[in-house]
Amino acid sequence: SGAMISQTSGHGDFRMIYEHGHTGCGCEMAHVEEIGASRIVDGPDAVTAATRENLRQGASQIKLMTGGGAASLYDPLDVTEFFEEEIRAAVRAAEDWGTYVMVHVYNPRGIARAIKAGVRSIEHGHLIDEPTMKLLADSGAWLSMQAFTVEDNTYPSPVQQAKHLQICNGTDRAYELAKKYNVKLAWGTDLLFNPAHTKNQNHGIVKLQKWFSNFEILKMVTSDNARLLAMSGARNPYPGKLGVVEEGALADLLLVEGNPLQNVDLLGDPGNNFSVIIKNGVVYKNKLQDGPASGNR
C-alpha cells in the first residue's frame, strides 16, 4: 500500500512535538515522510495526489488512517480523522486504478464514515458497536482484525499502554458481533517496530480459538485473506491465485506435522511443526530430505 496517508494530527503523523512542518503545509518533508512511512495531507485534492503518488510507486492498494491508534502519541482512540469527502477522494482515485482503499480505525464513528465513503476494508475495528457492525455487514466490506490481548502490550510509554488496554477490552465484543452479522473477516498481525516480534506472529492464529472453530481459523488466514487481497485486481503483485492448492496457483505451501483441523496449536510452533515451507515455488525448509533446502524449485 505504500506510505500510509494521514491527516495532520492523524495516526500517521508521527512527528515529534517540536517538528512543525510537513509537505501538506507546503513545508519541507517531516522525517516520517522522508523515510516513506507516511504522507501527511489535508483536503480532497491533497489526498487525491497522495493516493495517485502511491499508485505511481507501485502500491497494490491504498491505506488511510481515519481514527486514532495506540502506537501514536498525539491522537486519542476516539478521534475521527479525515472528512468523508477526503476519504471519498482516495476511494475514487484508487478505483480509477482498479483497486481499493483500506483504513486504520478503531472507533465506530470513524468506521461508519469510511464505509459511507466507499472503503472496502476496515483494519482493526476493535471498538466497533452493534449498529456500525450491521452497517459494515450490509456494505459487504471486510473487517481485518487482530486478536489483541493484554499480554501483547510492548509499548514503551504509559499513554500507548493505556490505549492498547482500551483496544484489548473491545476484542471479545468485536469478534462476537462480527460472527453475529456474518461479516467478512480477515486476519493480520500488525507487528511493527521490533523484528524480533515476528517469531511470535503465529500465536495470533492460536488465540483465535477463543472465538472460532479450527476450520474457521484456517479458512480465515488462508483463502479469506486471499480474497481480500485479490480485490486489488490488476494491481495484484502475485502471479497466481492465493489461498488455494490447485494447478496454476501461487505455490505458497506448508506441510505440518499433525492436523491443524484437529489442533491449531501446531501453528504456534512453526520451528518444530512445519516440516516443509514453500514460498512462491521456492523450498525454504524441508525436513523430509537430507541436504540444503533453500533455493530448490
Regions found by a protein language model. Give the residues of each.
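C-terminal cap of metal-dependent C-N hydrolases
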Residues: R235-N236, K241-S294
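N-terminal active-site wall of soluble small-molecule enzyme domains
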Residues: F83-A94, M102-I115
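His/Asp/Glu-enriched, well-ordered alpha-helical/loop segment
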Residues: D96, N169-P260
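Divalent-metal coordination cores built from histidine and acidic residues
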Residues: S1-D75, F82-A93, T132-K134, S139-P158
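Histidine/acidic-residue-rich catalytic or RNA/ligand-binding cores of hydrolases
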Residues: H11-D13, S72-Y74, I111-A117, D138, ...
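Hydrophobic faces of well-ordered beta-strands that scaffold small-molecule active sites
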Residues: S1, I62-L64, V101-V103, I122-E123, ...
